[in-house]
Amino acid sequence: MSRRCDLTGKAVQTGNLVSHSNHKTRTRFLPNLCNVTLISDVLQRKVRFRVAVAALRSVEHRGGLDAFLAKADDAELSLGARAIKREILKKQAAAS
């Protein structure tokens, strides 16, 4: 399982921990990922994702999972999230 957010693409970063004496130690900065179940209003079902906590705030800010995926760039989304996005857009187009 990769350490990458399914919705924002946030992943592991590398860098240095720098002490007061300017001693540098290489380290990995891991994203704060959690397994969540989000509800799609359009599909009327639950969808499981592994997302960063910051992504949860972004989903709520944009007005829910459906609105977030509609505006999200496909390059940032995981394959599963892209499939859900296509389902949502297809169902919205059929309803219109």
From Swiss-Prot:
GO terms for cellular component: cytosolic large ribosomal subunit. It comes from the Bacteria. GO terms for molecular function: structural constituent of ribosome. One of its GO terms (biological process) is translation. It holds the Pfam family Ribosomal_L28. SUPFAM superfamilies: L28p-like. Keywords: Ribonucleoprotein, Ribosomal protein. Belongs to the bacterial ribosomal protein bL28 family. This is Large ribosomal subunit protein bL28.
